[in-house]
């Protein structure tokens, strides 16, 4: 079957992004067995990032948001993150080495992954779900030290998407949305490009 049963208790407009951003962030959190006791970092606090924070918190993890925009801190905490690290600061990663079990990178801009990898605990994984236009490079030593892994994830299948929708219904999780009229679409696009959403 290709139809989903939508939770009756959730707003329809706020559920729409769950079928993209929702499952894209839920799937790797489940695959890497995030739950109580997990120490998770979410890089980026946009459309994907805010969903990753909500899901990881609901799964029982301690969540830290990594963002170059300190204006995102209040939203990160409102969604349940316990910590916020401003990655716009030089040497931001110092003092956070070997802290996280999992980093979910939701950023679509090019990032130097080396500082992020240094914050992974032994056997930690950095999962890429943002799609930058430039390739990144990683030194072998950054992976060998601590047996770290670098992986990627893209969306999820139909059964997992239904599981995610059910989880959202049970935990009252929806995307943050702004509903607009059709005549505002060009302005909305411009705002999205300018990161004004």
Question: Model segments located where?
Answer:
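NAD(P)H dinucleotide-binding glycine-rich loop of Rossmann-like/cofactor-binding domains
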Residues: 1-43
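Generic hydrophobic/aromatic pocket-lining and core-packing "Φ" positions
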Residues: 29, 53, 73, 113-116, ...
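Adenosine-nucleotide cofactor-binding segment
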Residues: 36-45, 57-115
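Short glycine-centered segments of the SAM/dcSAM-binding site in methyltransferase folds
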Residues: 39, 124-126, 149
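N-terminal Rossmann-fold NAD(P) dinucleotide-binding loop
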Residues: 49-50
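C-terminal hydrophobic helical "lid"/dimerization subdomain
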Residues: 114, 158-197
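Helix-to-beta-strand junctions that scaffold the AdoMet/dcAdoMet cofactor pocket
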Residues: 120-122
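Rossmann-fold NAD(P)-binding glycine/threonine-rich loop
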Residues: 130-147, 158-167
